[in-house]
Design a protein with these regions (language model features):
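Surface-exposed binding/hinge segments that line
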Residues: 70, 77, 145, 182-247, ...
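N-terminal lobe/hinge region of extracytoplasmic solute-binding protein
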Residues: 77-139, 253, 414
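Ligand/substrate-recognition segments at binding pockets and active sites
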Residues: 78, 265-267, 332-333, 446, ...
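Gly/Pro-rich hinge or "lid" segments in bacterial periplasmic/extracellular proteins
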Residues: 106, 116-121, 224-327, 335, ...
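Aromatic- and charge-enriched surface segment that lines or borders ligand/interaction sites
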Residues: 130-179, 207-209, 390-392, 397-399
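Extracellular/periplasmic solute-recognition and catalytic clefts
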Residues: 172-186, 261-272, 306, 312-316, ...
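Structural transition elements
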Residues: 420-483, 502-512, 603-605
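Long beta-strand-rich cores associated with HINT superfamily self-processing modules
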Residues: 574-575, 635-667
Length: 667
């Protein structure tokens, strides 16, 4: 799934992927113990970005409590710079699925499968085996029947059973939960492909039934990664959606080595090691194409399993937790958070976007600082609202796509700190990347004057008229904008159209792009103004069904997942945000929907890649998004801590939220 930047991250602007989006975090039953194993959700789940905060003051780091005597000692101190919106997992996936809420969320869910990092290998979590073949029920439905490992328990001592999966799905369906719940547990109907039933065959066998023959996207990287929560605890609150989302979560049972400790809204949050936990220990061995896991701590079920290709070079590490307390301290902004880091108040800063290059270079000269640089599995983008004029007009969107000179901004303004990205797929996923077509290809390499002329031609060919089409003087000068513009139906574009983007304090890259793109649209005769806006404000405006027609343009980002099925989540018409999904532009193309259905049914990766490229070709032409850039993920940590690995696509924040379950604090 994906996530708003990011796995545990910005609003599934953090598909952590497949519905596995980053939007969703680590759903492994080993949750914060074997954090190298995490399920996606998006993640697909919404999407790359860390919310910008304006209200929370910088604070003094929280005072750590004494760890439980029977557990590990030591405190792992992390900084955050936007306030989590909930500690309730149901609420998090429903309407508050931003990265900051995800970072601090306790391990309240389990999943059948998980994802092993840093190699992104599909593994079991609660399931005792990977079930990859469905059964045709002969009535238009298909089922996957999965055995669950017996012996796992929630922290309140109740057993993790198949009933938790059956009840969770029933709750999502009966209470009509929205947001990422629609992605991780898509409810099937006569009109929509999805899950139609989840049944506990017995306490340790669950049967998941679809109204189509679900492939990789729908099963292995979809429902098999979806969260299940404790029926014993949450059942008392599941009377209606509002009651469930408002239910207290500070004592909610977890499948993790940590439980909530101190929760001081607007200041700090802490986890404490649970001395009664079974979720600790074990050895993980990572291969380029496979993972081995051995676990026998005398308390949890003994496990010795391998997945994928376990040949070639490898490395192994012991699993934690190795600390007694995990501390999240809230600071007012990035600058305050990294100042605290420089002063030794925190060990690591959770930042879905990574450090700015100049600060990274500055910190590289500091004593006691370790540096990490990884490729990003995400993107920054601008969205058009296709439900209202002028975003509803294809020629308008294409003209904007043509006039925007991303390479100019990247190289001349941003000094090369970002990397151009045209399509939906990160360049690192070479087999998934489609060739650039349409206006982006036609306008590539053109001068400013040529781009302006081409954009005007696109408008004219699309039926637009103007009293005066203006002109471009050549060179770097601004164009004389057209006047009296009217769309193909004679409609005059609105005045003072706002382009919402995070401010420079939160993300100077998107802030800079918003200023240039607003100016380029003005040169085409459109009254567009860049409006710096807090991250959470943008999210509320564009991802809330009742506001789906109340904006023109916005910029956010997505952290993507382990399986790149995010185009279906972001652009299939049945995922429209007006109906609670992640299709914020309101893109509606029957041909795309048909390809999305084929993609969801694909059972071979090669087939999924071919279909994905056809979907991308439509997006290049219709342009619901103008994809902007991606960036390297730059991170730093203090040398008093150590991680089992640091080389991982999307970085330590994006894949493991700082890996609190495996970090070691050196005394």
């Amino acid at each position: 799934m994906w996530i708003f930047c990011i796995q545990k991250g910005e609003k599934l602007s953090n598909f952590k992927g497949s519905k596995s989006w980053r939007l969703i975090l680590l759903f492994s039953v080993f949750a914060l113990v074997v954090v190298a194993c995490g399920g996606d959700t998006a993640e697909e789940e919404v999407a790359e970005e860390a919310p910008e905060t304006t209200a929370a003051p910088a604070t003094t780091a929280a005072a750590a409590e004494e760890p439980a005597p029977s557990g590990p000692d030591g405190v792992y101190k992390m900084a955050i710079f936007s306030d989590p919106q909930s500690q309730n997992f149901w609420n998090y996936l429903d309407t508050n699925n931003d990265v900051w809420t995800a970072y601090v969320m306790s391990g309240q869910s389990v999943s059948l499968y998980g994802i092993s990092y840093p190699n992104y290998q599909l593994v079991t979590s609660s399931a005792s085996e990977l079930v990859e073949t469905s059964t045709d029920n002969g009535d238009g439905t298909w089922s996957y029947t999965v055995p669950i490992t017996e012996g796992f328990e929630w922290s309140d001592g109740t057993a993790v059973t198949a009933n938790d999966w059956a009840w969770t799905f029933k709750t999502v369906k009966d209470l009509a939960l929205i947001g990422s719940w629609n992605s991780v547990w898509p409810v099937g109907s006569d009109e929509v492909q999805g899950v139609v039933d989840v049944v506990a065959v017995d306490d340790y066998t669950v049967k998941v039934t679809f109204n189509y023959d679900a492939g990789l996207s729908g099963w292995q990287y979809g429902a098999a990664l979806a969260p299940a929560l404790s029926e014993t605890y949450w059942g008392q609150y599941a009377t209606d959606r509002e009651t469930l989302l408002a239910a207290p979560a500070d004592n909610a049972p977890v499948a993790s080595g940590f439980v909530y400790d101190k929760l001081e809204q607007g200041a700090f949050y802490t986890w404490a090691y649970d001395p009664n936990t079974m979720y600790y220990g074990g050895t993980t061995t990572i291969y380029p194409g496979g993972t081995e896991f051995s676990w026998d701590n005398g308390k949890a079920p003994a496990i010795d399993v391998s997945f994928g290709d376990t040949s070639g070079e490898s490395f192994s590490y012991e699993n934690g937790p190795f600390v007694g307390t995990v501390e999240f301290t809230l600071y007012s902004d990035q600058d305050a958070a990294y100042l605290a880091f420089q002063n030794g108040e925190v060990d690591f800063v959770l930042n879905p976007l990574g450090l700015k290059r100049n600060l990274y270079d500055q910190l590289s000269r500091e004593q006691g600082v370790e540096l990490v640089s990884n490729f990003s599995n995400g993107m920054r983008y601008m969205a058009f609202n296709m439900r209202i004029f002028p975003g509803s007009d294809k020629a308008f969107r294409q003209s904007v796509g043509c006039i925007v000179d991303k390479e100019f901004v990247i190289n001349n303004v941003l000094q090369g700190v970002a990397i151009n990205m045209d399509g939906q797929m990160p360049a690192a996923l070479t087999a998934w990347v489609a060739p650039v077509t349409g206006v982006l290809a036609d306008c590539d390499g053109l001068s400013a004057e040529e781009r302006w002329n081409k954009s005007v031609e696109i408008l004219q060919a699309g039926g637009w008229t103007a009293t005066d089409w203006g002109s471009h003087p050549g060179g770097a000068d601004r164009a004389i904008a057209p006047t009296g513009l009217k769309g193909p139906g004679g409609e005059t574009p609105p005045s003072d159209m706002l382009l919402y983007a995070p401010g420079p304090g939160y993300d100077p890259i998107r802030s800079t792009f918003s200023l240039f793109i607003a100016d380029w649209m003005q040169q085409l005769g459109f009254d567009v103004v860049a409006r710096p806006t807090g991250f959470s404000v943008i999210v509320d405006k564009v991802f809330t069904p009742e506001n789906c027609k109340d904006w023109y343009f916005y910029m956010l980002g997505w952290g993507l997942g382990s399986f790149p099925d995010h185009p279906e989540a972001f652009f299939a018409s049945y995922n429209d945000t007006c109906e609670g999904g992640y299709n914020t532009p309101g893109y509606n193309n029957a041909e795309f929907d048909a390809l999305a259905a084929e993609f969801k049914a694909a059972k071979k990766v090669s087939d999924a890649q071919a279909i994905s490229k056809k979907m991308e070709a439509l997006l290049f032409d219709d342009m619901p998004y103008l994809v902007l850039v991606t960036t390297p993920i730059l991170e730093v940590y203090r040398d008093n801590i150590s991680f089992p690995f640091t080389d991982v696509l999307s970085g330590l924040t994006g894949t493991g939220s700082g890996y609190p379950g495996n970090v070691k604090v050196n005394k």
